[in-house]
Amino acid sequence: MILFCVFAFVKGYAQTGQDDTKVYKKRVLETTEIDFLTSYYSQDGDNAAVTGGVGTEELTDVTGTFVVSIPLNDDDVLTIDAGISAYTSASSSNIDPFDDGPADPFQASSGASSSDAWANLTGSYSHSSDDRNDIWSAKLAISSEYDYFSVGVGGTYSKLFNEKNTEVSVSGNVYLDTWNPIYPTELRPFGAEGNGLSDRLFTQNTITGNTDYNPRFSEFDSKGRNSYSLGFGFSQILHKNLQGSLALDFVQQDGLLSTPFQRVYFGDVADSFIDDFQLADAVERLPDSRFKVAAGGRLNWYINEVLTVRTFYRYYFDDWGINSHTASIELPIKITNKFKLYPSYRYYNQTAADYFNPYEGALSTDAFYTSDYDLSEYSANQYGFGVSYTDIFTKAHIWNYGLKSIDLKFYQYDRDTTFSSSIITAGFKFVLD
C-alpha cells in the first residue's frame, strides 16, 4: 500500500512537470526514478560498551528506505530520501538489567531499551548549468530516535573543466543534535533528585561485594552535539581506461560527545553486584570537542569489457589519539550484458583513543574514560560479494514504473577482538515510463 501511494504521488507530479516543459536540451535526469533499499544487519561480541567493556554485543537491525529523484526541469532535480530502521539489542537492553529475572551482562533483559526505531527524512535539490560544468546542490536532513534528535543542512559545489576530464568540488555540512539522556538504572538514584541507596532498586534487591555502593555520577549539563564538516574533492580522468580521485575532509564536533548509558568500571574501586550484574562506577566521560581529519584517494582501472578494478585508501586521525588506515579493492566482473558480480575486500586498523581503557582499566582519578571498544586499538577485515541485474529497456513493470536494476550484496566483517557482524543489502531501481 505504501509503495502504491509513493508511485501514485510521484507519477502525478512528474507527469505535470513533463507536460508543462518543452525540452530544448538534454535533461540532467530524463525521468523520475525511485530506489527502494533494504538491509538486514546482525552483530555479536563480548565487549559491550553498555556494560563497561564486557557482556553481549548482540544486535539485529532491519532498514527500509525510499529515494525518489524528480526532474523539475532540464537543469534541476529534487530528491527525497525517507527511511526507517528498527533494531533489537541485547546490549542496550542492559541499560536496565533488573527488569526481568536475574541480571547478567551476557544475557538480554526485556524492557523499553531492548528495541528502538530510527527515522530519517532528507530533501536535496541540485542545479546544473547549461553547459553542465557547474553543479550546485543543497540538502536538509532530519532524523530521530527515542533518545536522539538531529537536524542537518549542507551544500556542495562542483566544477568540471578540461572537457569534463577534471572535476573539483567543495562541500559543507552542519548537524545540530540533541540528546534525551538515558542513564544506567542503578545510577539514576544518585542524580540531583535521587535518594541514593534508599531507592526502591536497592531496598528490593541485595547488594553483594562492596555493599557501600557510592558511584561517581552526575548528570551531564549539556544535551547538545554539533558537528561541522568541510570537504574538498578532486577527480581526474588519467586515461580512457583509468580514473583517479582525491578527497580531504575536516570535521569539528562540540558538545555532549559521551554516550550517557555506557558504563565504566574503575580498577581502584571495590566491585558491587546485584545478582551477577556489576553495578556501574560511572558513565563514559569524554572531552566536549573533537577534531577529525581524513585524506584518501580512489583509483579505478577499466581493464576490459569484463573486468574493472576499483581501489581505495584513506588515512584518518583525530585529536583523541586515534590514527587509522583503510584500504579496499572491488572487482566488478561482467558476466552478461545484464549481470555483474562484485567481489570485494576491505582492511582497516586503528590505534586506541587516549581515553580508552578495557574493563576495570580506568581509575577513579582519571578526568576522561571510556570502555567503548569502537575507540580501542583493533584491526578488521571485511569480505563482500554482490550481484547486480540491469535492464536498460525496463521490461518488467510495477504499474507505470519499469524495473531498471536490482543489486544484492553481502558483507562479513570481523575484528581481531570478539566482535563480528554481517549485512545483506538489496536495492531496486524503478524509472517512470
Label the predicted regions:
Residues T16-T32, N73-V77, D130-N133, N162-E167, ...:
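Short loop/turn motifs that connect adjacent beta-strands in outer-membrane beta-barrel proteins
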Residues E58-G64, S115-L121, D147-V153, G224-L230, ...:
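Residues that define the transmembrane beta-barrel architecture of outer-membrane proteins
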Residues F36-S42, I80-I84, A138-I142, V153-G155, ...:
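Transmembrane beta-barrel strands of outer-membrane/channel proteins
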Residues N47-V50, G55, G83-L121, E167-K240, ...:
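Outer-membrane beta-barrel translocator/channel fold
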Residues F66-I70, L121-H127, G155-K159, F232-Q236, ...:
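Residues on the lipid-exposed face of transmembrane beta-strands in outer-membrane beta-barrel proteins
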Residues D99, F106-S110, V251, L256-S289, ...:
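Outer membrane beta-barrel transmembrane domains
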Residues Y40-T63:
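Surface-exposed strand-loop-strand hairpins of Gram-negative outer-membrane beta-barrel proteins
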